[in-house]
Each structure stands twice: as C-alpha cells, then as structure tokens.
C-alpha cells in the first residue's frame, strides 16, 4: 500500500443510494454567471436562480462531492437534487433556515 492510496471495494459504487431526489428546471435570470457547489443547500442559492424553491428545501445537487454546476446568464437547465444527509440541520448559507429542516 502507498500512503494516501485508495483501494475501492469490488463492483459499482452508487452515489446517494436510496436518498429521495427531485428534478427541477432552473433558470439564471441574472446578468452574471452563478456557480453552485455540490453540497450547497439548493433552497438558499442566489435569488437570481428561478425554480420551484420549496421543492429544494433540504436538498443539494446530486453530483460528485467537490464539483459544481455553473449557470450562465439566461441559461435554463434541468438539475437533479438529492436530500441532505446527517442530522438535517442547516446553518449558514444565506441564513434562511438556521436550524432543523
């Protein structure tokens, strides 16, 4: 073994297996690009992103950790969100929840 080496288990690894998901159409109505990271509470993203916001409460992008999606001005795209795990308590971001979901 080499220090830092990762040896994954045999077979396919499925990200976020069994977690609830939702698919939303998101439009950037602003005049600047907006980038959203993999673990950002999607409900609290920039208000220039227009979508069914209540459906995104307690959800994040269903993409690999450490990655992001960029929404260019005027862009509209479909994204899949996945439920946040852990204790489901949200603090920070834009300060719209600051507590349990």
From Swiss-Prot:
Disulfide bonds: none
Main location: cytoplasm
Matches recorded under InterPro entries: Urease_beta-like, Urease_betasu_sf, Urease_subunit
E.C. code: 3.5.1.5
Catalytic activity: urea + 2 H2O + H(+) = hydrogencarbonate + 2 NH4(+)
Domain of life: Bacteria
Keyword terms of this UniProt record: Cytoplasm, Hydrolase
Enzyme class: hydrolase
Gene3D superfamilies in the cross-refs: Urease, beta subunit
Entry GO CC: urease complex
GO biological process entries: urea catabolic process
Pfam families: Urease_beta
Pathway this chain belongs to: Nitrogen metabolism; urea degradation; CO(2) and NH(3) from urea (urease route): step 1/1
GO molecular function: urease activity
Assembly and interaction partners: Heterotrimer of UreA (gamma), UreB (beta) and UreC (alpha) subunits. Three heterotrimers associate to form the active enzyme.
Protein name per the record: Urease subunit beta
